[in-house]
Amino acid sequence: MLCLHNFTGVYEKQDFYKDYPHKLFDDKALCGVRGYMDDKARKYLLEEIKEKSNLSSIHLLDSGNYHHLSRVYLDLIKEPYNLVVYDNHTDMQFSAFGNILSCGSWIADAYESLDYLKKIIVIGANSKYIEACEFNKDERVIFADSINEVSLGNDLPIYISVDKDVISENEFISDWDQGIMPVSTLIKELKCLRDNFRIMGVDICGEPDNSDDINISLSDNINKELVNIFVDILY
């Protein structure tokens, strides 16, 4: 099943999900969530997920400004696991506003607060962001250009989080600065994970600006390719 969190309305301009069982959550009126997530919004989204979604689904989170919703989904995991993230950024920069959850700090928050989370693997992050990350020497955190560079035993399941800003601008334009990974490479990476690990859940964000119809169409096609990888194993 596909669960779409429609914060900006961008999914109303896309078709990739219409061939699959799906739930489209109308979150456009929700305050306190874009970029940063306050406690009220976090509580609302957690209840929405518990009532209408489940962990073992494909979760579409809208633009990268809402990537911290991944952190809310991680609250549902109740067994040891590893987190694999595809992102041009580390998302491990602590918020300038104290403990408030943000799209740039959600992985750091997960690292510090989730006992079941054993290792964090970030694929495709820009080297300048890795150098600025205070976790870049931590043995629980691995930065790499490909999952093939990572020695990760398959004894633990994984949760996968994909921000499409990891994809090259030659493919489409997201709402954040982007990496250099071709879509074809990302697909190969995700298929490798699918074929070698138990997947607990997957989320995808990185939608373009809602007024950018050309890139919304390109993103729609990419979403369909990514969803097709997991649609037979996640429900």
Residue map of PLM features:
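Long, hydrophobic, well-ordered secondary-structure blocks that form the structural core
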Residues: 83-95, 106
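Catalytic cores of soluble, metal-dependent hydrolases
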Residues: 2-61, 65-82, 105, 115, ...
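Glycine- and acidic-residue-enriched helix-capping/strand-helix junction motifs
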Residues: 98-101, 181
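Short, conserved acidic/polar surface loops in the N-terminal third of protein domains
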Residues: 70-74, 93-99
